[in-house]
Amino acid sequence: MSAPSPYVWTFQPQRGTAAGASQDYSTRINWLSAGPELRGKVVQLNEARNAILMKEQESVPTPRAEANPSFWPAALIFQPRPQAIPVHPAHPDTFDAALTSNGAQLAGGAWINYKNGSVRYEAPLQLAEEQVGGPLNAFAIKHQLQLAGGALSASMSEMSGAPRIPRSGGIGSWQFSREFPPTVYLNPFSGSPDTFPHQFLSNYDSFSHTVDGYD
């Protein structure tokens, strides 16, 4: 008997909930081409995978009575504050300083002033036409580097995967990926039909808690 395939949860971004789970049949054995030796190796790999997933299931905290509620109060939503990501120059500081002193710039930038026969760059170093603001130089670029666009954004919430603040109707993809790992359900048909978890059915509606065609 082969190891059961894990159930992989699906994220519903409009509602901010888990939209049910379905089995990952990509791990199933092709019985037409698999011999006894290959079948045994695949079964061992699947059993090892299930052991890892079951251990992960036990370690995932679920501080709520219902694993997948249809409405998420704000107290149950984890909203991490995005951290700033400094961008360091690709070359040593001496190399960047030498290029700046010789008037090197990319795609626009400010004017270069000539004083006493030397070239001095007296504007914020940037990679676009728009000013980034603030007295910058090659040594302070790591916190102000930008690529062809507007001014720096004060928040990186659009890239963090966290829900926009304030939000009280659903979770974000960051929280979903950590609280809904692939689930291994052993012996799914050992009990009566009403004991089978509805969220593992492909036509389960997590919002109304009903199964299409059955309820």
Curated annotation (Swiss-Prot):
Keywords: Capsid protein, Host nucleus, Late protein, Phosphoprotein, Virion. The keyword Nucleotidyltransferase does not apply. The record marks G109, A110, G150, A151 as: Cleavage. The modification Phosphothreonine is found at T62. It comes from the Viruses. Residues 110-150 form a propeptide. One of its GO terms (molecular function) is hexon binding. Induction: Expressed in the late phase of the viral replicative cycle. This is Pre-hexon-linking protein VIII. Interacts with the peripentonal hexons as well as the hexons in the facets. Part of a complex composed of the core-capsid bridging protein, the endosome lysis protein VI and the hexon-linking protein VIII; these interactions bridge the virus core to the capsid. All late proteins expressed from the major late promoter are produced by alternative splicing and alternative polyadenylation of the same gene giving rise to non-overlapping ORFs. A leader sequence is present in the N-terminus of all these mRNAs and is recognized by the viral shutoff protein to provide expression although conventional translation via ribosome scanning from the cap has been shut off in the host cell. Gene3D superfamilies: 6.10.250.1460. Belongs to the adenoviridae hexon-linking protein family. GO terms for cellular component: host cell nucleus; viral capsid. Cleaved by the viral protease during virion maturation. May cause the middle segment to be shed from the capsid.
